[in-house]
């Protein structure tokens, strides 16, 4: 038990995701609110008694029980206003993460449950995670509407990570572990030729086609010739892939991988140098002659074979991988259209195309691998060959495993179109990691040139996420791909050639988070907003972690 210097107040907390469901809730819209509640809880425990309820239906019975005991209560709903009850007896305050420049309003009565202005007016006040959200609320509710801007107080929580994993521009080697699966670009044998798996019917038709092809009616311009430099680069790439196939253990036989890489090298680098007659002979050696078809007597329509489905990796194993060099990390839900993850990957692969010691680690907060696996493999295949490395981690990370990820990072990367706060960005900055990120929406509160490399962006119209009318009534931001690519290049150059500047930026990132989201200033602002004053006879409250749930 600890002594609280403030008047007694009971805080009733609720989030749709809790400790029991968090590992199964990756990718849900309410996923981030769980971490906001978890970060707020120690501050609230320092101001009064905390009660975490499993459902909103438990709020009023608990409120009446505490009221009979002569104690004040306040319900903090870690959810958007339209998912917060409006018929409770207990006073309610919404804790809101919102990334657009205006809040949903409903001119039609049938959409009233999505009208935030009515709900917030009923509550009378609100807590937001950023100045951007507070401005959006005041544009609708008026400048005098009580809104507290309160970022999550998480800086102190990363003291152990800062001590155990000091910032380093070039990682000498770190082991990452996850219970799920790891997709490594260097173990995939990537090639654009392997994007489409032929069906049995397509294979039969291809085998029966004659070798001689009739000349088209109009001349087709020949493809541009490959330069010697390009041929050498392709040769180097497949030599490296062949060496990896023999040196590392793999689910495929080594001979199969060697033949696969040899075939791809032949197609991309030397096939056009061989005479046509020789190419035909090689094709016949590789493709057996088709057997004669039996006479058909049936006139039934042939069945169309379906394309084979993608074989997904096993997601139940505990796997490890080692990363080294300049390591970029990003954490996001690939199903969230705001995250702009395609640009995050393409800009990296183009910026580091010839760089072998640059690695991009993507931690996916999504339970269903099938929702993005094909898109990811297609994108990486289209970008190949590239010398850099992309590692995708799918699954749930425990705290110790996440600490390894924090420690492995040289930079954290964000390329979002809009953010309500971006907890992962703040967490990596609290670990003393410089960043690559835009400075729009919530990130404008804590991102500038002293803590990272700014990605330029411009505004574009968009819709509110739950708008049933699908009208363009708000704005988000469009990150500039060229600016993101240049940020990768500039950050890599700093890490390799200017470690002093890197350490200065890392120190600035850590200091920014200490000023922005450390415990004491957040506690003071929260006490002032709720008009709590130091108590003459302070009461006992539960220690962090022992509050009733």
Please report, for each region that a protein language model flagged, where it lies by residue.
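N-terminal pre-catalytic "stem/leader" segment of glycosyltransferase-like enzymes
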Residues: 1-79, 85-88, 334, 359, ...
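Conserved donor-binding/catalytic core segment of Leloir-type glycosyltransferases
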Residues: 170-224, 230-235, 318-339, 345-348
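Nucleotide-activated donor-binding/catalytic signature segment of Leloir-type glycosyltransferases, i.e.
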Residues: 370-403
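Short alpha-helical donor nucleotide-sugar binding micro-motif in glycosyltransferases
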Residues: 403-409
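Aromatic "clamp/platform" in nucleotide-sugar-dependent glycosyltransferases that forms part
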Residues: 417
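A charged, aromatic-enriched C-terminal amphipathic alpha-helix characteristic of glycosyltransferases
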Residues: 475-486, 493-528
């Amino acid at each position: 038990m600890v002594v609280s210097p403030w008047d007694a107040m009971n805080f009733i907390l609720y989030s749709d995701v809790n400790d029991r469901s968090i590992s199964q809730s990756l990718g849900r819209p309410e996923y981030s609110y769980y971490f906001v509640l978890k970060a707020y809880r120690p501050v609230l425990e320092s101001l009064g008694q905390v009660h975490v309820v499993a459902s909103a239906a438990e709020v009023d019975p608990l409120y009446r029980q505490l009221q009979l005991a002569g104690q004040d209560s306040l319900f903090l709903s870690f959810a958007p206003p339209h998912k917060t009850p409006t018929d409770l007896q207990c006073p309610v305050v919404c804790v809101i993460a919102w990334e657009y420049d205006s809040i949903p309003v409903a001119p039609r009565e049938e959409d009233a449950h999505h009208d935030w202005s009515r709900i917030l007016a009923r509550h009378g006040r609100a807590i937001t995670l950023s100045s951007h959200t507070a401005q959006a609320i005041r544009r609708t509710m008026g400048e005098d509407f009580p809104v507290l801007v309160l970022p999550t107080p998480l800086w102190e929580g990363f003291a152990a990570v800062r001590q155990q994993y000091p910032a380093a521009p070039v990682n000498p080697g770190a082991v990452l572990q996850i219970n799920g699966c790891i997709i490594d670009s260097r173990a995939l044998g990537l090639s654009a030729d392997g994007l489409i798996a032929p069906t049995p019917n397509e294979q039969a038709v291809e085998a029966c086609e004659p070798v001689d092809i009739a000349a088209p009616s109009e001349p087709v311009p020949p493809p541009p010739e490959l330069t010697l430099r390009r041929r050498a680069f392709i040769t180097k790439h497949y030599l490296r892939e062949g060496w990896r196939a023999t040196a590392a253990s793999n689910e495929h036989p080594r001979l199969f991988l060697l033949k696969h890489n040899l075939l791809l090298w032949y197609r991309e680098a030397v096939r056009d140098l061989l005479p046509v007659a020789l190419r035909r002979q090689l094709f016949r050696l590789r493709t057996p002659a088709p057997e004669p078809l039996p006479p058909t007597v049936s006139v039934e329509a042939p069945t169309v074979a379906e394309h084979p489905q993608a074989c997904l990796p096993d997601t139940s194993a505990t796997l490890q991988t080692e990363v080294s060099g300049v390591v970029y990390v990003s954490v996001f839900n690939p199903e969230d259209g705001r995250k702009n993850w395609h640009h995050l990957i393409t800009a990296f692969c183009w910026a580091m195309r010839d760089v072998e010691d640059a690695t991009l680690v993507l931690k996916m907060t999504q339970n269903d691998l099938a929702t993005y696996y094909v898109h990811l493999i297609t994108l990486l295949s289209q970008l190949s060959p590239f010398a850099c490395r992309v590692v995708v981690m799918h699954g749930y990370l425990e705290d110790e495993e996440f600490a390894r990820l924090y420690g492995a990072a040289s930079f954290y990367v964000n390329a979002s179109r809009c953010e309500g706060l971006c907890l992962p960005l703040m967490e990596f900055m609290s670990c003393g990691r410089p960043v690559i990120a835009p400075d729009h929406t919530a990130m404008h509160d804590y991102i500038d040139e002293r803590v990272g490399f700014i990605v330029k962006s411009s505004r574009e119209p968009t819709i509110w996420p739950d708008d049933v009318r699908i009208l363009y009534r708000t704005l988000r931001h469009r990150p500039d791909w060229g600016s993101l690519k240049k940020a990768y290049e500039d950050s890599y150059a700093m890490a390799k050639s200017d470690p002093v500047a890197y350490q200065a930026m890392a120190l600035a990132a850590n200091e920014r988070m200490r000023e922005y989201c450390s415990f004491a200033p957040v506690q003071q602002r929260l006490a002032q907003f709720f008009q709590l004053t130091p108590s003459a006879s302070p009461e006992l409250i539960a220690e962090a972690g022992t509050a009733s749930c």
